[in-house]
């Protein structure tokens, strides 16, 4: 039987950026709904993003990171200017 080398996926982090319009409640909701953060962790991360200007929501294979970022952007688009970045982990 021939063995195939399966490539390791490129890992990427999803980074949420702070802004002055998106509510804390929306950010916590997005962190819980799309990044599976427990309430307390989501609240701490939201405060960190507010204080530091950005924060890492999670690290995923590239395609999953893009999907999660797009889902959050789509949910935010109607009411908030929330921005997310996907950045390769080196």
From Swiss-Prot:
Q: Which InterPro entries match?
A: ClpS, ClpS_core, Ribosomal_bL12_C/ClpS-like
GO biological process terms held by the UniProt record: protein catabolic process; proteolysis
Q: Which Gene3D superfamilies match?
A: 3.30.1390.10
Q: Which family does it belong to?
A: Belongs to the ClpS family.
Q: What role is this protein assigned? A: Involved in the modulation of the specificity of the ClpAP-mediated ATP-dependent protein degradation.
Assembly, in brief, is: Binds to the N-terminal domain of the chaperone ClpA.
What name does UniProt use for this protein? ATP-dependent Clp protease adapter protein ClpS
Q: Which organism is it from?
A: Helicobacter pylori (strain J99 / ATCC 700824) (Campylobacter pylori J99)
- Taxonomic placement: Bacteria, Pseudomonadati, Campylobacterota, Epsilonproteobacteria, Campylobacterales
Name of the gene = clpS
């Amino acid at each position: 039987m021939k063995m195939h080398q399966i490539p390791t996926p490129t890992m990427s982090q999803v980074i949420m950026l702070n802004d002055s319009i998106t509510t804390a409640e929306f950010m916590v909701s997005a962190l819980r709904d799309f990044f599976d953060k427990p309430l307390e962790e989501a609240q701490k991360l939201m405060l960190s993003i507010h204080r530091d200007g950005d924060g890492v929501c999670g690290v995923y294979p590239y395609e999953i990171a893009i999907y999660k970022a797009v889902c959050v952007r789509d949910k935010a688009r109607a009411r908030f200017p929330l921005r997310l970045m996907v950045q390769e982990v080196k």
